[in-house]
Amino acid sequence: MNKILLQCDNLCKRYQEGSVQTDVLLNVSFSVGEGEMMAIVGSSGSGKSTLLHLLGGLDTPTSGDVIFNGQPMSKLSSAAKAELRNQKLGFIYQFHHLLPDFTALENVAMPLLIGKKKPAEINSCALEMLKAVGLEHRANHRPSELSGGERQRVAIARALVNNPRLVLADEPTGNLDARNADSIFQLLGELNRLQGTAFLVVTHDLQLAKRMSRQLEMRDGRLTAELSLMGAE
């Protein structure tokens, strides 16, 4: 088994509005190995997106902890979490969240700029990542000049430009048609093989989940046993 990269220990998340308490996550525990491609399947409102926010250090659990590469996130300062997100984690969302006034190349370069890389390194790394997703010829185009599939490829390039250890993906093919969704999954698999990047994808798409190496199911804020998707349509 691969070395554990990320581990969740009894994660709970509760929101409170006045006297009303809502438990969104209940004692969630699992781990992701280095280079693993894993899916968490669940319907809308099951707690999947909340879980990703906790894993990425974007929110704080009510109880429990997230341990990344042996380091508990509860012991990290806000600045240290931000550095971790910039250098070790990548994020892909259902909507691409590209900056509309920037070119594809400039969007991909943004994490490198935040990480204060040298200008020459920023340009070459961003262009190389666009090449890896098959879009070097679109480097100087803005998001409005790209198709939906191309915009999502740019978002993936941006997530991977810092060579993160783990990419957290929230419904990465949710806004794409079947052909583009298949193309995006093939791209994720190729990048996993070439770079050894681990992927944790949360989705309601059983066909996407079926193509990952391991699947878990989330229902009402709880992770169930590993999901069998044999014969899923």
UniProtKB/Swiss-Prot annotation:
<dbReference type="InterPro" id="IPR003593">
    <property type="entry name" value="AAA+_ATPase"/>
</dbReference>
<dbReference type="InterPro" id="IPR003439">
    <property type="entry name" value="ABC_transporter-like_ATP-bd"/>
</dbReference>
<dbReference type="GO" id="GO:0016887">
    <property type="term" value="F:ATP hydrolysis activity"/>
</dbReference>
<dbReference type="GO" id="GO:0005886">
    <property type="term" value="C:plasma membrane"/>
</dbReference>
<dbReference type="InterPro" id="IPR017871">
    <property type="entry name" value="ABC_transporter-like_CS"/>
</dbReference>
<comment type="similarity">
    <text>Belongs to the ABC transporter superfamily. Lipoprotein translocase (TC 3.A.1.125) family.</text>
</comment>
<dbReference type="GO" id="GO:0044874">
    <property type="term" value="P:lipoprotein localization to outer membrane"/>
</dbReference>
<dbReference type="GO" id="GO:0005524">
    <property type="term" value="F:ATP binding"/>
</dbReference>
<feature type="binding site">
    <location>
        <begin position="42"/>
        <end position="49"/>
    </location>
    <ligand>
        <name>ATP</name>
    </ligand>
</feature>
<comment type="function">
    <text>Part of the ABC transporter complex LolCDE involved in the translocation of mature outer membrane-directed lipoproteins, from the inner membrane to the periplasmic chaperone, LolA. Responsible for the formation of the LolA-lipoprotein complex in an ATP-dependent manner.</text>
</comment>
<keyword id="KW-0067">ATP-binding</keyword>
<protein>
    <recommendedName>
        <fullName>Lipoprotein-releasing system ATP-binding protein LolD</fullName>
        <ecNumber>7.6.2.-</ecNumber>
    </recommendedName>
</protein>
<dbReference type="InterPro" id="IPR017911">
    <property type="entry name" value="MacB-like_ATP-bd"/>
</dbReference>
<comment type="subunit">
    <text>The complex is composed of two ATP-binding proteins (LolD) and two transmembrane proteins (LolC and LolE).</text>
</comment>
<dbReference type="Pfam" id="PF00005">
    <property type="entry name" value="ABC_tran"/>
</dbReference>
<dbReference type="GO" id="GO:0022857">
    <property type="term" value="F:transmembrane transporter activity"/>
</dbReference>
<dbReference type="InterPro" id="IPR011924">
    <property type="entry name" value="LolD_lipo_ATP-bd"/>
</dbReference>
<dbReference type="InterPro" id="IPR027417">
    <property type="entry name" value="P-loop_NTPase"/>
</dbReference>
<dbReference type="InterPro" id="IPR015854">
    <property type="entry name" value="ABC_transpr_LolD-like"/>
</dbReference>
<keyword id="KW-1003">Cell membrane</keyword>
<keyword id="KW-0997">Cell inner membrane</keyword>
<feature type="domain" description="ABC transporter">
    <location>
        <begin position="6"/>
        <end position="233"/>
    </location>
</feature>
<keyword id="KW-0813">Transport</keyword>
<keyword id="KW-0472">Membrane</keyword>
<keyword id="KW-0547">Nucleotide-binding</keyword>
<dbReference type="GO" id="GO:0089705">
    <property type="term" value="P:protein localization to outer membrane"/>
</dbReference>
<keyword id="KW-1278">Translocase</keyword>
